[in-house]
Amino acid sequence: AVARAITPKTKAIIPVDIAGVPCDYDRLRFIVEEKKSLFTPSNDIQKALAHIPIVADCAHSFGASYKGTPTGNVADFSSFSFHAVKNFTTAEGGCATWRHIDGIDDEAIYKQFQLLSLHGQDKDALAKTKAGAWEYDIKGTYYKCNMTDIMAAIGLAQFERYPKLLACRKEIIEAYDVAFKDLPVTLLHHYTDEHQSSGHLYLVRLDGRDAEYRNKVIEAMAEAGIATNVHYKPIPMH
């Protein structure tokens, strides 16, 4: 489906690591290489990549890995969410990562992200406090989404406990897998030879059942004190 959707207008492929399970990135790389003749770069980064960029939505997969490589260093660019409901949280916010691109200065990409997140200012508050460094410029009409010091402190504290949280989630998921083994449901495979999940969500498809039956299951689970949800409604159903 991805290959069929690519046209000369395609500027990026945005896969989603749903529930914490990494996508098949080898397959995506094969597709972008196969379709590279359709891609017309419009800036220096795109020219250096020489293929349609893979920009991964890793909101669910902080701590996951694909063939031994942590998510965040698999796709060309990746974005993570640190929202309050995520495995790894700073209460709000997130981060972006990228793989090194030959011919492109990583520091230049970093500075561009800084401009985008700090409403175009070319110096942050700390830099402006240094002797004689008060002057700054506005390089563009960008966004206000820089992380606060408090959020960063929460994130650093989370780093210390996160390996234990991942191990705990894996233990719970493996217990669920055993419990659901003989039931008529389809499950995501969180842990395989190719990938290790972050265990963000445990998704269950009720095979051959309609929405009415699903809703009854949700109600019964709620009565048992177990919260469940539907992730996610297709856009046309909203």
Language-model features: where?
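Adenylate-forming
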Residues: T90-G93, A153-G155
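Active-site phosphate-binding strand-loop segment of PLP-dependent enzymes
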Residues: V2-T90, A96-D102
